[in-house]
Amino acid sequence: MTQSTEDTLLRLAAVIDSRKGGDPDQSYVSRLFHKGDDAVLKKIGEEATEVVLAAKDVRQGGAPTALVGEVADLWFHCLVMLSHFDLSPADVIGELERREGLSGIEEKALRKRREREENGG
C-alpha cells in the first residue's frame, strides 16, 4: 500500500466519521449510522456476497471492472463499520503491518496462543 493509498483511505474515513451526527434524511452514511449495528452489519454481508458473485462472474467471462466496483463497495462499507465501532483504517493497517512477514500458519498459531493466554489457559 502506498502512502497515497493510505491517505485516500484516511480521507474517506474522515468524511465517513463526519457523517456520524448527520441528518439521516440527507446522507446515506448518516442513515446507516442512525439505523444501528444491524443495518451496518447487514450491509457488509450484502456487499461481501456481491463480491463473491462478481468474482465467480469474472471466471465465467464477466467484466473484471464489475468485481473491482463490488470490492470498492465492500471496502466503503467496511470503513463505515469501522467508524461505527469507533475504529479507523489505521487500526487495520497496523494489524496488517504486524502480520507482515508471518506465514498464515504462524499467524494463526500465535493468535491461538494469545487467546489461550487471555483465557487463562
From Swiss-Prot:
EC number in record: 3.6.1.31
Domain of life: Bacteria
Coiled-coil regions listed: none
Main localization category: cytoplasm
Enzyme class: hydrolase
Subcellular location(s) of the protein: Cytoplasm
Gene (name only): hisE
The name this protein goes by in its record: Phosphoribosyl-ATP pyrophosphatase
Reaction(s) this enzyme catalyzes, per UniProt: 1-(5-phospho-beta-D-ribosyl)-ATP + H2O = 1-(5-phospho-beta-D-ribosyl)-5'-AMP + diphosphate + H(+)
Record key words, sorted: Amino-acid biosynthesis, ATP-binding, Cytoplasm, Histidine biosynthesis, Hydrolase, Nucleotide-binding
GO cellular component: cytoplasm
Statement: the UniProt record of this protein carries the keyword Nucleotide-binding: yes
InterPro entries hit by this protein: HisE, PRib-ATP_PPHydrolase-like
